């Protein structure tokens, strides 16, 4: 006779009480704090000489133990079909440099399984980034779901591994890595299509682009002139002081456009700051 059962979600397989218990485990204030402090979820991790190799699990050790206990208790009484799996569809890392482009060094980033003593890259998904390549976005996609088990004294789960190479003479932070992911937990698992690790080089942000318009540059020059005139231009002649004040007023007050050919129009043209080489 063919199997006629239906696939049930984790919430359907467990009672409402145990489902609430799982929510408390995952989203309690303590769990959220542990995800930030132990896993650096959504936080910037600094790569320094004294931290040349960084291994960051995607689940805090305490949270891992509580989730594993939740699934095991449901499995032992026949409410759940397994002792639990961790699923991570994708891990996305934003990498930026914190030294000049001529610094000789690189980063090696990959996803590993803490159940592997060697911490080898999962399915060869590994990305190397030279310092002059940065900034960049890196992505990893595990091809399987990780069992929530303990191997030796290690809580098995996925982890982001970052290795710093080179950067001779740079003992401080040479790169910043911000990782984001969304871990899922279920009593069922699957295998997934193998996808190579993604590496997208990003153009550095041009923060001066908004000041390329003449109007923005003119405002910048006016503000600079206004800042230095009172401290540097100390004139003794009263008549010249009066003229200097009128120049300042021309720079600070935007008057309505005067008619072409009028004396006021020629006067404003005389005191207009000049733009040199697009600045």
Curated annotation (Swiss-Prot):
Print the keywords alphabetically: Host cell junction, Transport, Viral movement protein
> Which residues are connected by disulfide bridges in this protein?
none
Localized where? Host cell junction, Host plasmodesma
Any keyword Amino-acid biosynthesis? no
Coiled-coil regions listed in the entry: none
GO BP terms: namely:
transport of virus in host, cell to cell
- Extent of Low complexity compositional bias: 254-268
Q: What's a GO cellular component annotated to this UniProt protein?
A: host cell plasmodesma
InterPro entries, per database record = MPV
* Purpose of the protein: Transports viral genome to neighboring plant cells directly through plasmosdesmata, without any budding. The movement protein allows efficient cell to cell propagation, by bypassing the host cell wall barrier. Acts by forming a tubular structure at the host plasmodesmata, enlarging it enough to allow free passage of virion capsids.
Task: Give the protein's recorded name.
Answer: Movement protein
């Amino acid at each position: 006779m063919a199997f006629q059962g239906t696939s049930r979600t984790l919430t359907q397989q467990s009672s409402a009480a145990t489902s609430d218990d799982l929510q408390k485990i995952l989203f309690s204030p303590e769990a959220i704090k542990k995800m930030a402090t132990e896993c650096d979820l959504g936080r910037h991790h600094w790569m320094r000489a004294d931290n040349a190799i960084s291994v960051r699990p995607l689940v805090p050790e305490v949270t891992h133990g509580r989730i594993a206990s939740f699934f095991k208790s449901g499995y032992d009484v026949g409410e759940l079909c397994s002792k639990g799996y961790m699923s991570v569809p994708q891990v996305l890392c934003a990498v930026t440099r914190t030294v000049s482009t001529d610094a000789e060094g690189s980063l090696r980033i990959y996803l590993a399984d803490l159940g592997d003593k060697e911490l080898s890259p999962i399915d060869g998904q590994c990305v190397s980034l030279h310092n002059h390549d940065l900034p960049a976005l890196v992505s990893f996609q595990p091809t399987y779901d990780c069992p929530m088990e303990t191997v030796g004294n290690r809580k098995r789960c996925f982890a982001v591994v970052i290795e710093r190479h080179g950067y001779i003479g740079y003992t401080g932070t040479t790169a910043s890595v911000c990782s984001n992911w969304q871990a899922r937990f279920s009593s069922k698992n699957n295998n997934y299509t193998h996808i190579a690790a993604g590496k997208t080089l990003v153009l550095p942000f041009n923060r001066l682009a908004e000041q390329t318009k003449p109007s923005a540059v003119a405002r910048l020059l006016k503000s600079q002139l206004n800042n230095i005139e009172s401290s540097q231009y100390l004139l003794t002649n009263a008549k010249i002081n009066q003229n200097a004040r009128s120049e300042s007023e021309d720079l600070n007050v935007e008057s309505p456009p005067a008619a072409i050919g009028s004396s006021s129009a020629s006067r404003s043209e005389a005191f207009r700051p000049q733009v040199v080489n697009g600045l």
